From Swiss-Prot:
UniProt keyword annotation of Membrane present: no
Gene Ontology MF terms: rRNA binding; structural constituent of ribosome
Keyword annotations from UniProtKB, A to Z: Ribonucleoprotein, Ribosomal protein, RNA-binding, rRNA-binding
PANTHER family referenced in this protein's UniProt entry, alphabetically: 60S RIBOSOMAL PROTEIN L23A (PTHR11620)
Top-level division of the source organism's lineage: Bacteria
Organism, as annotated: Caldicellulosiruptor saccharolyticus (strain ATCC 43494 / DSM 8903 / Tp8T 6331)
Xref: NCBIfam families: PRK05738.2-4
Gene: rplW
Family: Belongs to the universal ribosomal protein uL23 family.
Protein name from the UniProt record: Large ribosomal subunit protein uL23
C-alpha cells in the first residue's frame, strides 16, 4: 500500500490535541495496515522519525435517524509518538 492509502486523515479532538506537546499524533488509518507500515508511512509523508506506534480498532456504533437504525463504520486509529530529536508535524502546529 502507498503511504497516502495508509494514512487516511488526522484525528482532531480535544484529547488528541492535548497529546501534541508530548509529540504524540493521532490518525485514522487503513484497517489492513500494521504498525510497521504505519510507521513507514508517517516517516515518508511528514519527514519525521517515529519512536512508537499504538493502534486500536474502533467498533461501529448504533445510530438512528428517525425510525431507521443503522451502524457507523468500524475503523482503525493509530497514535504515533515521535523521537525527541525529530521535528514536529507542521499541520498540527497550525491548529494549536
Amino acid at each position: 500500500m502507498l503511504p497516502e492509502e495508509i494514512i487516511k486523515r488526522p484525528i482532531i479532538t480535544e484529547k488528541s490535541m492535548s497529546m501534541i506537546p508530548q509529540k504524540k499524533y493521532t490518525f485514522e488509518v487503513d484497517r489492513r495496515a500494521n504498525k510497521i507500515e504505519i510507521k513507514k508511512a508517517v516517516e515518508q509523508l511528514f519527514g519525521v522519525e517515529v519512536e512508537k506506534v499504538w493502534t486500536m480498532n474502533v467498533k461501529p456504533k448504533r445510530k438512528r435517524v428517525g425510525r431507521f437504525e443503522g451502524r457507523t463504520k468500524a475503523w482503525k486509529k493509530a497514535i504515533v509518538k515521535l523521537t525527541d530529536k525529530s521535528k514536529t508535524i507542521e499541520f498540527f502546529d497550525s491548529l494549536i
